[in-house]
Amino acid sequence: MSNSYVIGIAVGIAFGIMFVAFIFSYLKKKGKDICEYDERQKLAQLKGWKAAFIAAVCFDIINAAVVEARGPWSGMMVMAICSLYVGVGAYAAVCIVKDAYTPLHRRAGRYILLLLALALVNIAIGALNCQSTGLIKNGMLTMSWVNFFAAALLIGIDAVYAIDVLVKRRRAGGRDREE
């Protein structure tokens, strides 16, 4: 990985943090609270963090065993990012199932569309990266896979979200019929 690539990643992360901070400060000045969670949701989010930690640690242990037995399957950065993605996926799944993923008074539709759009952007960026670096180098996965893994994570979260919405609608429809 070249220095310009690492600098690009660092600048992108810094820009993303500044952008999110700007949006939150702007909305706070307007008096809008976009993250209104009740106590039940906050407790469920703590369970999500616990699941994320356990999932990431389990991934790291399994990954270490695979690397020890068969050799590295990718660079260290790709492995670390995959561990992060596994944790984020576990957190999202637990929070979605326990109705703690979105703030109160928000509909799931906008989040499902946003996650799908972000997945498509990651697929496009991954495809562009593949043209310049390729997918495999020296028998190991390259950084180009990170975007595809991110897209898979976002599509997985989207699928869990959509299934959760459909199950809840079906339950609500069943309750209406019983009454």
Where do the language-model regions lie?
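Membrane-interface segments at the starts/ends of alpha-helical transmembrane spans
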Residues: 1-6, 135-149
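Hydrophobic alpha-helical transmembrane segments in multi-pass integral membrane proteins
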Residues: 57-63, 118-137
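Membrane-helix boundary/juxtamembrane motif in polytopic membrane proteins
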Residues: 42, 100-120, 173-178
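Hydrophobic alpha-helical transmembrane segments and immediately flanking/interface helices
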Residues: 68-96, 149-154
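Cytosolic, membrane-interface loops and tails of multi-pass inner-membrane proteins
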Residues: 29-44, 175-178
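A generic, lipid-embedded transmembrane alpha helix
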Residues: 47-66
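Membrane-water interface of transmembrane alpha-helices
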Residues: 16-33, 81-99, 163-169
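Membrane-interface helix termini and inter-helical loops of multi-pass transporters
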Residues: 68-73, 130-141
